[in-house]
Amino acid sequence: MPEGIHLTSMSELLTFEEIVQVVRTAAELGISHVKLTGGEPLLRRSLPTLVQMLKNIEGIEQVTLTTNGILLKEYLPTLLKAGLDAVNISLDSTDRDTFRKITGFDQLDMVLAAIDAACASGIRTKINAVSLDLGEEAMWNLIDLAKDRPIDVRFIEMMPIGHGKDFPVYSHTKMLELFKERYPDLTADKAMHGFGPAVYYHIPGYQGSIGLISAIHGKFCDKCNRIRLTSTGFLKGCLCYNTGADLREILRANEAENEKRRHLTETMEAAIYAKPRAHCFESAEDVTERATMNEIGG
């Protein structure tokens, strides 16, 4: 977690019941997959209860979680019982010192234990690593997590949002060239790995796969099927812009429930149809979003 972040009071956060109202409306509008992200979602007390509540909504086919992994092993049995379908674990380095510098905590062992626990449980597991220029050895060590584990190790181009603006974007074109040099038998993996934009590759002899999510150098906005709901109830169509809709204001309005449901549906539908055609991260002056990723969720 970066230093100097804005801490949100509990009164500003959507309650579980309010989140369920939004997701139920989203399901009525045709959305079927939900991912709980952060910040760190497992810091939210009783999160497995929310997972179960979301799984019980008609039309919701899948609920997944993105976590830093530190609390995952502890909560995994309860999450599985609640019906969690898959988990993404954020891990940028397997080197203890580098991990501590990035996260501020010396808890790499807990994350690695969580990865093994997730694999042992059978839940679909992916590793999300932001593509930082930490040297080739760091990259190979991350990829080797997929050697004896049935997981996807995915490299994600740094998004120039919040603290991400302070880092150069590490090109996946260069990264793929390095992959092919080290693994000459690397092949494209055409198997279905989910509903996201990652392009996957397989190394012979490895149980898992490698994925590249190239938001900057491999722009996939024409295929983007996502909207984001912040913890405070703001619905966003694109990470690049500060546009969207304040759903918390509607959820807490003093009006009849049927009017509130109608207002919520109309507002969400309008926000979805107003989703920008493409991001503008190539042109920094056009980016209007000022929040950090931990505030937005991702």
Predicted regions and their residues:
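Short, flexible helix/strand-to-coil boundary loops that buttress conserved ligand/catalytic motifs
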Residues: 1, 76, 103, 239, ...
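Canonical Radical SAM [4Fe-4S] cluster-binding loop centered on the CxxxCxxC motif
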Residues: 1-15
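Short, solvent-exposed loop/turn segments at secondary-structure junctions
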Residues: 8, 45, 73, 162-163
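Radical SAM/AdoMet-radical enzyme domain recognition
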Residues: 13-36, 43-156
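Radical SAM enzyme [4Fe-4S]-AdoMet core and its adjacent flexible, acidic
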Residues: 97-100, 105-209, 215, 249, ...
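Short capping micro-motif at the N-terminus of alpha-helices
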Residues: 210-212, 237-238
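Radical SAM enzyme core and accessory elements
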Residues: 219-298
